[in-house]
Design a protein with these regions (language model features):
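N-terminal FAD-binding dinucleotide-binding subdomain shared by FAD-dependent oxidases/monooxygenases
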Residues: 2-5, 10-13, 19-148, 165, ...
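Active-site "gating" loop of Rossmann-like NAD(P)-dependent oxidoreductase/epimerase domains
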Residues: 149-153
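Residues forming the flavin
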Residues: 173-189
């Protein structure tokens, strides 16, 4: 099969890319490893899995898709996201151009034919002029190695491989290793199972924020839909894809009373408002950042009555600058961790030594991972415009010059160093969650509008690229 564009991945990015490329006259096709659309939402069915970007921003902004779709909650769960992608498929007729259960094992660019040669796990060969990798940042799951893990006689399951049919945890001893977003969501569900004895191994503190989950009526959404166009525009123009009316002054220009009142308002709103609505210097001024942590700790400590657990989950000393690691949204995480049937282990002090047939052994005693759709749409729009430009100018292939790549890398790292992100080295933002991986900023921290400006300015001419016009003609 031969296409103008081959897209790898059938999540938000792949679906929107296929739709936009079709509109621009390209023949396009998606190769999807799973059996359905949805990407991360097709793969994840673990207890409590749900989106942490609030309605209506975590969806495609296409009117033909949202006009007949109604969300049931402010933060929809994985089952509802699966139904949403079924709806997207029905409206946009995505599946007619998708190869499901197909894994790409190789992709090479043939300079003679100026085409990509893509090989799948079945041996099928696909060719295309352009290749779009819409695989997302969570496609490859990380499973740490532990001595003796193969000896364990119980069930070991990575959340991304949690069976759709579920696992019966009633009256079971359960261990959760990790306290990131997935760990938080699993704890909130598993800790409440009848007869469960839960042990949670915590490596890094999670400065989790209140979700403020609630049901949303169809009437409320119908009212919101009248201003969806404005809301989506505000989201696109915002730094993180989630609009918030934050203050324009720096922290030191405010009084304690003014700060506390504003933070209380953000806290009541829930979601990521406590982060996106902060004073302008919170990622630059360490003292301003410390004040935010102290407020968070004050609001959170009272929810954990057990002093040993409280010292692990809400330490007196700020563990890292707030906002430099993605905070998780929680509903009753701290109350669940405080339950008598839940044990909390600080693995920095009591590390995991090995696994045995019956469980996990620590060093001192045995005991039982931006609002994506908004950003994705803008990236796809940029890519589509770029491919149209190449087609109009009859350009066969294009590749960034090494000097341009190095300049971009330095730009990304320079912004990182100028902010308090440089003081936190355990975040997945810098690859800190993978042992042995080089620690460097993996995200552009200048915000979505500036990122797109950089992209468009960098491609307004071909000075940063090696360009081929017609096969074999380098410019």
């Amino acid at each position: 099969m031969d296409y103008d564009v081959l897209i790898i991945g059938g999540g938000f990015g792949g679906c929107y890319a296929l739709h936009q490329l079709r509109k621009s006259g390209f023949s396009a096709h998606i190769v999807e490893a799973g059996s359905a659309l949805g990407g991360v939402w097709h793969r994840n069915s673990y207890p409590g899995a749900r989106v942490d970007s609030e309605t209506p921003y975590y969806q495609l902004s296409l009117r033909e898709v949202w006009k007949d779709w109604t969300w049931s909650q402010r933060f929809p769960g994985h089952a509802e996201l699966k139904r949403y992608f079924t709806h997207v498929d029905k409206v946009l007729d995505i599946s007619k151009d998708v190869s499901y259960n197909t894994v790409v094992v190789g992709a090479d660019f043939d300079t003679v034919t100026a085409k990509w040669i893509i090989e799948t796990d079945s041996g099928r060969i696909i060719t295309s002029r352009f290749l779009v990798t819409a695989t997302g940042s969570s496609i490859k799951r990380y499973e740490p190695e532990f001595a003796g893990k193969d000896l364990f006689k119980g069930i070991i399951v990575h959340p991304a491989a949690w069976p759709v049919s579920g696992i019966d945890l009633e009256n079971k001893r359960v261990a959760i290793i990790g306290s990131g977003a997935t760990g938080v969501q699993c704890v909130q569900e598993i800790a409440k199972q009848p007869g469960v004895k839960l042990t949670v191994y915590v490596r890094n503190v999670n400065i989790a924020l209140p979700m403020r989950q609630r049901e949303i009526s169809e009437l409320e959404q119908d009212s919101l839909k009248a201003i969806y166009k404005t809301l989506f525009r505000l989201a696109r123009d915002s730094s993180a894809g989630l609009p918030c009316d934050g203050p324009t002054q720096v922290t030191k220009e405010t009084t304690t009373e003014e700060r506390e009142a504003w933070w209380e308002e953000l806290w009541k709103r829930g979601a990521f408002n406590f982060q996106t609505g902060q004073y302008t210097d919170f990622l630059v001024d360490a003292e301003a950042n410390r004040l935010i942590y102290e407020f968070w700790a004050k609001k959170t400590k009272c929810r954990v009555q057990n002093p040993k657990k409280r010292a692990i989950l809400v330490p007196d000393k700020q563990p890292f600058p707030f906002g430099t690691k993605r905070s998780s949204l929680e509903q009753d995480y701290y109350e669940c961790m405080d339950q008598d049937n839940v044990e909390v282990v600080d693995v920095k002090k009591t590390s995991i030594r090995e696994w045995t047939a019956r469980g996990i052994v620590t060093e001192d005693a045995p005991t039982a991972l931006t609002n994506a759709p908004v950003f994705i749409e803008q990236q796809v729009d940029f890519i589509t415009d770029f491919l149209v430009k190449l087609r109009m100018e009859k350009i066969t292939s294009i590749e960034p010059r090494r000097s341009a790549e190095e300049h971009w890398k330095k730009t990304v790292q320079a912004i990182h160093e100028a902010l308090l992100f440089s003081k936190s080295d355990t975040s997945w933002y810098v690859g800190g969650n993978i042992p042995g991986k080089k620690k460097e900023q993996l995200n552009y921290l200048g915000g979505i509008p500036q990122y797109l400006k950089e992209c468009r300015e960098g491609t307004k001419d071909w000075s940063n690229f090696n360009v081929v016009v017609g096969v074999g003609n380098a410019v």
